[in-house]
């Protein structure tokens, strides 16, 4: 029995040592490609979830890069099968920016692909590409906190603050750890990182299983894929919408809706 206990202790120490080295390699930055599935946990679908659902973006692939200062994401919905992202996000400790120009381009292309003549009626995008969380909140008629994702940058890859856990939907052969933040609020985000045990021994990118809950936004996200240690240089987008563009964007959205109704009626 004593030998068995010693073996277990040694195995646990080795595993934690491997995790320690792996976490340190990710602390400076990483790149990743992950399949994702987002579900709503709120009684009423949250604003951001509704936007994604309208474009079939609640499941698909997310490619991105991470540094301790910022996070950059590209979303590729499973339903579209397009080589172009639905939208891009830039998340720093100070703000969340959404690529509204890319989202509009995706919408316009999906319409003109089915109704080529609609391209004459639907104008091209002629504003700054990125919309801020405050501008998006104003457009959606919600509070600023509903469009802010800065909490995604609060998770700390600090070995002293990482707790070993075993989630209900754990995958076989994975070690799971909960990353903590300094936010003690009841609705603070919770991130559980699962790393394939065999991947801890490899120099290449390990397979991961990530569970992310953001109670403040009423969403749960499950991600699977690979993460690679990297040292990317992320800079905030310079092509940004002005506050005065919001009225133009509202008018543009109304134009698109009117054109879609017209071409669908003409085609029926």
Regions found by a protein language model. Name each.
Residues 2-268:
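Subset-of-secretome marker
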């Amino acid at each position: 029995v004593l030998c068995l206990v010693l073996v277990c202790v040694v195995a646990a120490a080795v595993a934690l040592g491997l995790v320690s080295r792996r976490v340190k390699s990710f602390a400076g930055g990483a790149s990743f490609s992950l399949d994702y599935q987002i579900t709503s946990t709120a009684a009423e679908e949250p604003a951001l979830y509704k936007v994604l659902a309208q474009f079939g973006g609640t499941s698909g692939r997310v490619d991105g890069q991470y540094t301790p200062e910022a996070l950059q994401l590209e979303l590729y919905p499973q339903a579209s099968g397009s080589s172009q992202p639905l939208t891009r996000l830039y998340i720093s400790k100070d703000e969340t920016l959404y690529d509204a120009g890319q989202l509009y381009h995706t919408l316009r292309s999906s319409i003109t692909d089915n109704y080529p003549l609609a391209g004459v009626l639907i104008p091209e995008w002629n504003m700054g590409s990125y919309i801020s969380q405050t501008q998006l909140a104003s457009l959606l008629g919600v509070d600023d906190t509903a469009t802010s994702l800065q909490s995604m940058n609060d998770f700390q890859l600090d070995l002293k603050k990482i707790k070993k856990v075993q989630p209900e939907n754990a995958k076989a052969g994975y070690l799971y750890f909960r990353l903590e933040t300094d936010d003690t609020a009841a609705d603070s985000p919770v991130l559980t990182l699962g790393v394939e045990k065999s991947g801890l021994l490899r120099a290449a990118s390990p397979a991961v299983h990530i569970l992310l809950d953001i109670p403040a936004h009423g969403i749960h996200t499950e991600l699977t894929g690979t993460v690679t240690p990297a040292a990317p240089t992320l800079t905030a987008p310079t092509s940004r919408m002005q506050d005065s563009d919001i009225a133009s964007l509202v008018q543009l959205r109304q134009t698109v809706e009117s054109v879609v109704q017209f071409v669908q009626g003409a085609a029926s």
